[in-house]
Amino acid sequence: MLPDFNKVSGTKWASVACDQYTSQKDYWDSVCRFTSGSYTTLDLMLPEAYLDNESRLIPEINQHMKIYARHVLLEHKSSMIYLERTQSDGRIRRGLIGCVDLEEYDYRKGSDSLIRATEGTVLERIPPRVAIRREAEIEMPHIMILIDDPCRTVIEPIANNAESLEVAYDFDLMMDSGHVKGYFVSDSVLENINSALDILASKEAMAEKYGVDAAPLLFAVGDGNHSLASAKALYNEIKEKIGNDAAMNHPARYALCEIVNLHDTALDFEPIYRAVFGVDQKSFLSDFKAYCANLRGNADEQKVNIVFSDESETVTIPHPESQLAVGTVQNFLDIYTKTHPEAVVDYIHGEDTTISLAKGENTVGMLFEGMSKDMLFKTVICDGALPRKTFSMGHAADKRFYIECRKIR
């Protein structure tokens, strides 16, 4: 479902994902002022910056959904949208907007479902989201799901023939966040997409890419895992209420999302480093070295640079148990903070920022090689999920904006 963009301003309609700018209420206040008096997806969602007002806002949101579903949104049946998103840096990220089957999704660590979470799901974060979704008439996606398609067989062929497709929308995004242009995907292109996805999900493709004999992993949730987990939780509620057979035909069985190729050149993975406060720096380094020396895993050798004051030392881990250096670091910190409750861990974007923080008293920085894109799927398959706060996918201004809607009742 989309509004008629001949009558509705796309720039005012589309707003960024609710989990962005959570500590910057002034951003959201500016959005409120900018969209005042216009049809906007801001009316249909709850920014996390306003969670302290959720009891008042949720009924308003649900009422807006009913009004918009009846008087603003137009239905486009059986449609998929090819999206070209010009980011704030000028690069174009390409994606497909469509539905995934929640029967094929399991957010639990160690799952062997076709759709899996990339990071551990915090179960406590699901009930509040389910409460919002339970009475919602429509959904909007900020979920971004990744496919591992190095040969670019699914999305990129559409880009080469996009001009032959009907344009769904074409407008600038608010707050200097770039531009979006969407196209309705034709039936013949849909067939090509499904065929290419079938090949990616084959056992042969899994063995060739990852060197493992494991259940196929086609879709890895990059952004919005807790939203997708909430959709799954509500769908499970509905199944219990109406029975499995009836649930197979219920619209809540599916969830709207954007599918992006992991290998899209506009998609950046930025490592998230660690700063540890309130520790004796020398003892911390000694404890970390002892921990690493006792590991007996079979992952490839890793290196972690420990920085504090004006010193640094690179610790080599010959036999790590985690596929990623960040996993080794996080496993150590989980153990360390249990025996050192005074230690506080923070998750830091940027090497320079980490080094600067580590100059502080009783503070240590931990730097390591970021995860390459090629490691994402293999790590989820082998380790069950990535360590928390492994990587960031781009800046807030380049996250998904709410544009498309879908009925779930």
Segments predicted by a language model, with ranges:
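Short beta-strand segments
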Residues: 146, 221-222, 258, 367-368
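Catalytic or ion-translocation cores adjacent to nucleophile or general acid/base/metal-coordination motifs
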Residues: 225-288
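C-terminal catalytic or substrate-handling cores of phosphate/nucleotide-
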Residues: 276-390
